[in-house]
């Protein structure tokens, strides 16, 4: 999905940074809530499509009032999406404003996992099931690995701060920084100069636990 989004933006370089961020949040939000959005669309009698999911997420996931959404789409017919059709306006107005989740949703839909996988996860996670699945519904943190050949964590943190990007030390890896908020890390000089790379802190820990020494050959086997 990230490659599709990046390719779409590459073909539309006129889109500003704020709009890029807003569009990205919409796309990722819809992906994280696909099952729940589908459930809501069925409740209000709407056909599932990319557009209907975005409209539903704008109301259910971002708290936009249906009336405000109607006015917003009617105010910019040149660059914005097409105004709502009468049928779209009908079902959008039926959407509640209390969020994506509902007590009537089956567990697999509420937790955004296939039924068969939910059964297996319940067996393996037991009492931690709900906490783990709730975490998967949240945006992932942006972790960075400091390149020790070029910098140290404190120096890399200062370099990023100079570009307006605040970070905090990782909790476990001595080489990790975690971005506070979402920022275009790849556009920073610190990233271009190789001071940091984007890498999950868990992956950094795996690399440390292998005990790799200079001269060793490593096979990075990714399932």
Predicted regions mapped to residue ranges:
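Class I Rossmann-like S-adenosyl-L-methionine
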Residues: 1-187
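Class I SAM-dependent methyltransferase Rossmann-like catalytic core
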Residues: 18, 190-197
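Glycine-centered loop/turn positions within well-structured domains
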Residues: 142, 204, 216
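Conserved hydrophobic/aromatic pocket- or pore-lining residues that grip, position, or stack substrates
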Residues: 144, 198, 206, 222
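Active-site proximal loops enriched in glycine and acidic residues that flank catalytic Cys/His/Asp
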Residues: 148, 181, 200, 222-223
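Glycine-rich helix-loop-beta junction characteristic of Rossmann-like nucleotide cofactor-binding loops
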Residues: 188-189, 208-214
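Conserved class I S-adenosyl-L-methionine
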Residues: 215-222
